[in-house]
Amino acid sequence: VLGNGDTVFIRPLTPDDRPTLAEFHRRQSADSIYRRFFSPKPELSDKELLHFTDVDMVDRAALAVESHDELIAWASYERWPGRSEAEAAFMVDDGHQGAGIATLLLEHLAAIARSNGIERFTAEVLGDNRAMLAVFAKAGWPLQRRFDSGVVDLDWELADTDEFLDSVERREQRADSRAVTRILLPRAVAVIGASERPGSVGDAIWRNVANSVDVPIHAVNPRHDEIHGHLSCRTIDQLPDEVSLAIIAVPARDLDETVDACITKRMRGAVIVTSVDGSDVDVPALVTRARRNGLRIIGPSSMGIASPRPETRLQAALVDVALPPGGVAISMQSGSLGGSFLRKARDVDLGVSWFVSLGDKSDISANDLLQFWEQDDNTTVIAMYTESFGNPRKFARIA
């Protein structure tokens, strides 16, 4: 997860990536190429492509970063012969610079290097490459610097200093928080599986969303052009590009196709109300596919999300309970308990900032919500029920 909330896929480069790396290089600006190679280099030679991709991930390592199956960055290190030091280098696509990709790559490269007995990194950076110098400076390691002929030579120990650990924690907090922000504060919402059939999940969700949210809303139903007086799209690809959040209430058999269509539409979040119990849906594979392409998921089997506060008003939950706005954020994994809790909160006039039903908790977790609510000025108390911890150490650190 990047600092802006986007998700990317990081993997080792292999010789099969030579054509992809060559194409990536060709589409970069002359300035970016010069800052990486210190000379004009419109093309990478076959020898260079093989050198960069044929690595053992011990003395020489190289990582690729992909978004929507496109290579958007790569980084490498090479061990100095006979030493426990390696030189690191990075290149990020012109259109993705400034998103924290180099910082994330640096952390991953350092972890690989340390596991292979490499104790120090070195790097050469052009003196006017302020963005890359800032990446190293903010990583949390004490740097040794030497300036020679317009080039800054950097040298640092790959140690778990307090500054490094704090830097990683701050980056994680920003990334997790912004990923949740994109779901809870959408630009526009689509209810996929919206229905007019009384008593159906699609009907309940659509009615609640239509009567609450202040951002544009859209319905998707393959058999209707109108839902309760609102125009409805037959397919997801007919939705406007502004839609960033999907509330999914379709049969389990249609879930994979629906999520793939949301990915193609480049949505940022999905709340899956659909239950997959007893179905053939491969949830881990679905989530992996979604995350690789920038789509974060709450659910499946979620009761939805809600906020009664005027500035964030949204009622995309199955339980239609009128709650007073306040400072209590509620996270529930159990759907039935969530409904009971909301009704009790209403009865005792408990002011609520957010309600999130995590359901099966396949992607967005309690830890992610904690990171978001930690920086939310409207939240003063967190009430949370969870049946398991995917990362208990991280939960304890955040809480």
Regions found by a protein language model. Name each.
Residues 163-399:
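Catalytic-core regions of core metabolic enzymes
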Residues 1-182:
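Long, contiguous binding/interaction regions
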